[in-house]
Amino acid sequence: MQDVKTYLSTAPVLAAIWFGILAGLLIEINRFFPDALVLPYV
């Protein structure tokens, strides 16, 4: 069990989990607020 904890706390695994969460969050934000990065010309 200690080896599994050591593996899950390594940088590539944590980076993959973080980027997965971040990508999902950005996808959900774009689903509810589409084109939020485009400034409308008023």
From Swiss-Prot:
Record-given protein name: Photosystem I reaction center subunit IX
Free-text function comment from the UniProt entry: May help in the organization of the PsaE and PsaF subunits.
Keyword Ribonucleoprotein: no
GO process annotations (BP): photosynthesis
Keyword Transmembrane helix among UniProt keywords: yes
GO cellular component: chloroplast thylakoid membrane; photosystem I
Membrane topology: Single-pass membrane protein
HAMAP family referenced in this protein's UniProt entry, alphabetically: PSI_PsaJ
Membrane-spanning segments: 7-27
Keywords: Chloroplast, Membrane, Photosynthesis, Photosystem I, Plastid, Thylakoid, Transmembrane, Transmembrane helix
UniProt cross-references to Pfam families, sorted A to Z: PSI_PsaJ
Cellular location(s): Plastid, Chloroplast thylakoid membrane
Lineage: Eukaryota, Viridiplantae, Streptophyta, Zygnematophyceae, Zygnematophycidae
Family the entry assigns: Belongs to the PsaJ family.
